[in-house]
C-alpha cells in the first residue's frame, strides 16, 4: 500500500502524506531501515 511504499522509499514526507494515523509506525520503520538524511 502507499504507506508501506512511503516507508520503503525512506521518506518521512510520504509517511505524512499517506500513513495518516500510522505515521509513527512509518517514521520508526524509516529510522530503523534507512540511512540519514531522511527526505
Swiss-Prot record:
* Pfam families recorded: E_raikovi_mat
Recorded GO molecular functions are:
pheromone activity
Q: Which domain of life is it from?
A: Eukaryota
Q: Which UniProt keywords apply?
A: Disulfide bond, Pheromone, Secreted
Is the Chloroplast keyword given for this protein? Answer: no
Q: Which InterPro entries match?
A: Pheromone_protoz, Pheromone_protoz_sf
Q: Where in the cell is it found?
A: Secreted
What is the disulfide pattern of this chain? Answer: 3-19, 10-34, 15-26
Q: Where is the signal peptide?
A: none
Cellular component (GO) terms are: extracellular region
Subunit comment for this entry?
Homodimer.
Briefly state the protein's biological role.
Answer: Mating ciliate pheromones (or gamones) are diffusible extracellular communication signals that distinguish different intraspecific classes of cells commonly referred to as 'mating types'. They prepare the latter for conjugation by changing their cell surface properties.
Name of the protein in its database record: Mating pheromone Er-11
Gene encoding it? MAT11
